[in-house]
Amino acid sequence: MKAPYAWLLAGCLATGGAHASCGAAFCSSSNDWLTLTQDVAAGWRAWMQAEYIKQDQLRRGTEKLSPGQVASHHEEVKTLNRNALFGLEFGFMPEWSASLVLPVSNREHLHIHHHHGTPIPETWQYDQIGDARVTLRYQPATRATGNTSWSVQGGLKLPTGRTDVRNADGDEAERSVQPGTGTTDLLLGGGIARRLDALPGTLFANLTLQAPLDENGGYRPGGRAGLQAGWLLPVQGRLDLILQGNVLHLMRDRGIHAEPEDSGRTEVALVPGLAYAWSRQVSVYGQLELPVYQRVNGIQLAHDYALSLGLSFVLD
């Protein structure tokens, strides 16, 4: 892929954080699609991303469990996440841009409540807006003219998602599977991308942090830290191969309506994918997240893979 297209796509892949908007249930940690490797462009840029994550594997620590191994009053069975993320970025100064990300979640959750030895399945299914994210990004234009580009960003996750979704029986879902957390969270991040003379393509890395600033109704979600690093490798023409690795650490939830014993996790994943620059304005991409290490606190549901597909375009 020619350099201008490679820089465009590397920027789309370098700053993780889309996971910050889908409530406390698991969402993809791979992408945030904010441009890193080019100057802040004046005007508007939009992107949309679809995610599929099926959590149906019980884990205790790093060990996989079968349902028969769990002796609990409350047995988790499945959480199916189909998320759509919509992002909009506006470059209002040569080195500054502002962005808004709004998630929409289609989520199905099933657990079994054991009442005096009788298993009672309880299910929830909803389509809801999650917690929005607003950020400011600073990228020195002078640094993007050479082989290295970097940026920093900060912002807030806002409590726009509901925290009181109920099922057909009138039972309220656990706070961890609600579309929103009810809290305002601080978001910080920074990334770097570099083209090396000795290697084709672009290397990139990004660190993101998220910390709740308050609690809501006796619930405070755990903080998050994510590290993404990878290599955007030209394949042919405008097609690039994405070789990426992610590390995600989630702290325990707190509060009287939280489940601190069964929340918090550490995950390492390989994330291969493809990116195609349709034009200088439009890019499409797809990635497959494959966990290679998962450690959970207590007993939790985990996933075997996650899939994301997206589209990014500049609005002239």
Annotate each language-model stretch with its function.
Residues 44, 96-100, 143-145, 198-203, ...:
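Repeated loop/turn-to-beta-strand initiation elements of outer-membrane beta-barrel proteins
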